[in-house]
Amino acid sequence: MSDQIIDAAQARSVQANAAKAQVLFGWIIQHDPPEHPGKYVARFATAHPTIYIMLADTLAELQAMLPPGLARSPRQPVDPPEIVEIWFSKQARRRIW
């Protein structure tokens, strides 16, 4: 399965489809993963990571590309070292925490 690089408009569409289906979703932000060295990567995830990713040179640039309606969850000690943060829907965050 290879990554499909999407832009901010496509990310809004992917996220809207997940919201309509009422599934838990989020964007996993990584820095410098082996398949995209030196880049920040936002990977869309539902029950599992998907093929949809956005790429940027900086964290701020990538955060600006994320669709609206998200809440940031900081990196947890159990996360792999390349994970920087995870963004969940605000509704999901209220249910989880």
Language model: regions and residue ranges:
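Short, Lys/Arg-enriched charge-dense amphipathic segments
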Residues: 50-51, 57, 94-97
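A short, charged, amphipathic alpha-helix used as a generic interaction element across diverse proteins
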Residues: 52-76
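Short N-terminal "domain-start" leader segments
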Residues: 2-39, 71-75, 81, 93-97
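A short, structured beta-strand/loop element
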Residues: 36-51
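Generic structural motif
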Residues: 32-34, 47, 59, 91
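Cysteine-rich, disulfide-bonded extracellular modules and peptides in secreted proteins
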Residues: 51, 65-67, 81-88
